[in-house]
């Protein structure tokens, strides 16, 4: 049996679209937003509104998900050839909450460890990534909202095939490995983000690699070759819209407005961090991550109140540095 494929959510549709508004032209964004695949019934409508988090006091929060589809066929985007979710067939191996503040000054990316030991509605306690396997997008969103008390405004999902396509679409990425910068194509970058056993902190370092990759994709997109060449820009947007699926509440008009409002955000304005962790443990024979509830609540409160800039300035966080590893 082949090793379990670990998938990075390269979910850069929003970020890359923002970067391309100024370079490729608004016409391209307007044209391609209509091609984005929509996921029907992504939200937990079975949960009464009174039991769901209140809207944030400013900005919007997205849940970005990378899934291990265990399929040789693409499962997300308009080119999908297999279902995006079947019971027990997929796990969300990468989950990031992305908060875009009301002042459009930054983007805050918070990774949720896939092995976080959490309450999953209707299933008791289990690893966070099991929620998608058992109940698809609605159960995962419900679980994340109950964990954080943060309203998830929108969802974006990409699978393994989409990850590789996205990397190759931007012309590959530059990542630092053992002190040397290497240029990687989609297949090579997948190996980079899958690595765990040979990293000092295992899954925690792999999470940083996932964040490094996302930043590298955005940086690569900013190259003159991608931004000033209409053909290259069109090819890139075509690949993005073919690979990524979003919830059906995110209309074409919403997406265009979102991209326009955040058009000045650049890779250097993105703040990457991890949800605070108390420790690792073994529960029911499984290696799990126990989140630090007190420290996590301060982070989630800042996200709810749209005050993440103040939070980052006053808290020591497990943040991604300026280099790569």
Indicate residue ranges for each PLM-predicted region.
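Extracytoplasmic
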Residues: 57-60, 90-95, 104-112, 123-125, ...
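Flexible, polar/acidic helix-loop-strand segments at domain edges
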Residues: 60, 162-239, 244, 324-325
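C-terminal solvent-exposed extensions
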Residues: 72-73, 77, 184, 245-325
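Second-shell loop/turn segments in exported
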Residues: 83-86, 126-134, 149-154, 197-205, ...
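Sec-exported extracytoplasmic/periplasmic mature domains
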Residues: 99-102, 117, 133, 145-149, ...
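Amphipathic, coiled-coil-like alpha-helical scaffolding segments used for oligomerization/assembly
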Residues: 128-181, 249
């Amino acid at each position: 049996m082949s090793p379990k494929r670990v998938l990075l959510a390269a979910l850069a549709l929003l970020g890359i679209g923002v970067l391309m508004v100024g370079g490729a032209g608004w016409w391209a964004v307007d044209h391609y937003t209509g091609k984005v695949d929509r996921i029907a019934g992504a939200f937990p409508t079975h949960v009464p509104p009174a039991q769901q988090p209140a809207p944030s006091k400013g900005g919007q929060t997205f849940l970005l998900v990378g899934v291990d589809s265990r399929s040789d066929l693409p499962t997300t985007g308009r080119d999908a050839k297999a279902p995006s979710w079947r019971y027990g067939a997929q796990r969300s191996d990468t989950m990031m909450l992305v908060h875009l503040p009301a002042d459009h000054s930054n983007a805050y990316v918070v990774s949720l460890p896939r092995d976080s030991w959490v309450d999953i509605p209707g299933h008791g306690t289990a690893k966070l990534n099991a929620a998608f396997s058992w109940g698809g997008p609605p159960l995962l969103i419900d679980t994340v909202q109950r964990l954080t008390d943060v309203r998830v405004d929108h969802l974006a999902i990409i699978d393994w095939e989409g990850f590789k396509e996205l990397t190759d679409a931007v012309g590959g990425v530059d990542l630092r490995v053992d002190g040397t910068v290497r240029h990687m194509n989609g297949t090579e970058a997948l190996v980079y983000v899958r690595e765990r056993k040979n990293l000092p902190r295992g899954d925690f370092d792999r999470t940083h690699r996932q964040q490094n990759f996302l930043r590298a994709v955005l940086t690569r997109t900013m190259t003159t070759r991608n931004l000033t060449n209409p053909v290259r820009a069109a090819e890139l947007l075509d690949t993005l819209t073919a690979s990524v699926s979003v919830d059906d509440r995110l209309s074409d008009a919403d997406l265009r407005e979102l991209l326009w409002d955040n058009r000045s955000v650049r890779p250097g304005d993105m703040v990457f961090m991890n949800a605070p962790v108390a420790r690792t443990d073994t529960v029911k024979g499984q290696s799990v991550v126990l989140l630090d509830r007190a420290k996590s609540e301060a982070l989630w409160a800042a996200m709810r109140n749209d005050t993440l800039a103040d939070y980052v300035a006053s808290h020591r966080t497990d943040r991604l540095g300026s280099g790569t590893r």
